[in-house]
UniProtKB/Swiss-Prot annotation:
UniProt xrefs under InterPro entries: GIY-YIG_endonuc (IPR000305), GIY-YIG_endonuc_sf (IPR035901), GIY-YIG_UvrC_Cho (IPR047296), RuvA_2-like (IPR010994), UVR_dom (IPR001943), UVR_dom_sf (IPR036876), UvrABC_protein_C (IPR050066), UvrC (IPR004791)
UVR domain: residues covered: 232-267
Protein name: UvrABC system protein C
Span of domain GIY-YIG: 43-122
Pfam family membership, one: GIY-YIG
Gene transcribed to yield this protein: uvrC
SUBUNIT field: Interacts with UvrB in an incision complex.
Protein source organism: Prochlorococcus marinus (strain MIT 9313)
One of the record's GO molecular function terms: excinuclease ABC activity
Location, primary (coarse class): cytoplasm
Amino acid sequence: MRLTSLQRVGHTAVENNLSNASQRTILLKDENRLEQRLKEIPAEPGCYLMRDVEDRLLYVGKSKCLRNRVRSYFRSSSDHGPRIRLMVRQIAEIEFIVTDSEAESLVLESNLIKNQQPHFNVLLKDDKKYPYLCITWSEEYPRIFITRRRRFRNKNDRFYGPYVDVGLLRRTLLLVKRSFPLRQRPRPLHQDRTCLNYSIGRCPGVCQQKITPQDYHQVLRKVAMVFQGRNQELKVLLEKQMERYSDRMDYESAANIRDQIKGLEQLTEGQKMSLPDSSVSRDVLAIASDHRVAAVQLFQMRAGKLVNRLGFTADAVDQTLGSVLQRVIEEHYSQVDAVEVPPEVLVQYSLPQQELLVDWLSEHRGRRVQISCPQRQAKAELIELVERNAVFELSRAKSGQQQQELATEDLAQLLELTTQPRRIEGYDISHIQGSDAVASQVVFIDGLPAKQHYRKYKIKSSSIKSGHSDDFMAMAEIMRRRFRRWARVKQEGSNFENLQRCSGSALQTDGLNDWPDVVMIDGGKGQLSSAMEALRELDLHEDLVVCSLAKKHEQIFVPGQSKPLDSDPDQLGVVLLRRLRDEAHRFAVSYHRQQRGVRMNRSRLTDIPGLGPRRVRDLLAHFQSIDAIQLASVQQISQAPGLGPALALQVWTYFHPEADIALEEVA
């Protein structure tokens, strides 16, 4: 890439001297700014980024000619769908990154979309029903586990998936752990000895370093081949290794390898679907869509057998099926190793930039990759098979969506709302006798958790402290902090009603997009009264729909009524509120435990002579937990920021008072 830093189009000296965000906002609202930008865009390959007046990223795109591509959005003759037309009306700023080639821009675009999540791009949904398998290569002794969250704590960690059949994934991992000795626990069970897993051959004893990191990585690389679909290649590798051990008369090691081969054969026995040609390796992608959501299935065929079935869900509004397929291909193959890219990829529809993808995949693999859209014979039958699976996954997703719509409709009837609530928020308080008091705000959108909108609060009231709790006061404080911004908008008369209606939609561009249709308080009449009193102070008590859900008999209370609403605990609207209440409780309790653990850890470390608040904070940041500090050696502790050998010895001695070690031995 020729220009590695972000280039703002027409970046002036005035912009270089901007001292605060308000000045930049003034420039973004300049009517002539965008017209000037369009004149200065270079006719070179690269990526372009479009922002609104609030400097929020709307869209990321790529092109072999930035000037022609960006200008096409603003031509009256361009045939854009309603989604793109809506985006164009919001564009206030255009930025670009110039690259050496169009292939480079494709990789850059994929990374920008993944990291920034622009609103108008075709985004793969964070669908937690499809699990991943993670290998933490960033650790000295990596772990392997199943997760539904694809979060890279370290760029070296590796995710495989998302897998459609979680049962098959669990059985595969169980068989792998029986065949290959792997780290079984996230933390050691004992400080000074191995556990039972080592004794029965399930673990190589990583907690006591019975195996070197290099040898353990060799074992794990073989395991990774299973989830890369390279079973046949792994079998050949193991057979050669077994022969070498036999030639050296190391029959015990040869027997261990033989058992691993048997375990691998058990895995391949379950791969019933196969192709006539056992040498064929290809990926097959098909899609099913209802014009709102698309379900994409990817079948991985290796050595003639179906080894993996992956599933993706993507936004499909105002998108062609080919563009959705292309986005899935870009997302998936940008995160796999070169050995996982097959020589052939079959797709159901032609891709908008198929030749570019062929070049990019070929470069990534190191050998030629072919992308084709078959119409006849066996390859077309494969596409039809994958499409049937995609249709099934889409219908299953729509069935769950219909259930959520029925729940929100029932809730609207229960609370006498004129429209179905789209955004509902739940609040709960958590503490132990007033200590470490916190609150949670959880959000459901269209009946499903929207975790990107969750919020955590530390209770600031000085009257709520250890030994003195007041849930009512805490709830009132949270209501004030949550809605005071909206109260200011209402007082200023800034078109308050229109902002409420547009909140949460793509039409809203003023930054106020979090007005809830329903607010639910975890508790009874007391908590509800406290919340309403706080909202009355903000003059929002008549604008918000507020209710509370008491644990006893799942009773729903609303303002102005002393008795609970007439409802059935099993009706869909009540079940939705109960899910919201339970999620708010879980989120609040987990945050409270986190805060309590931090406080207890700090108080324990502050007992060590020479450790002040800053060094305690640095030590915890370095090791993440007291247990890790306790298991560390003096040399490892001395590597923490601000700790030399003498202070590291002091810390180590605090946790090992029976040990006898001198500073000279450490040095």
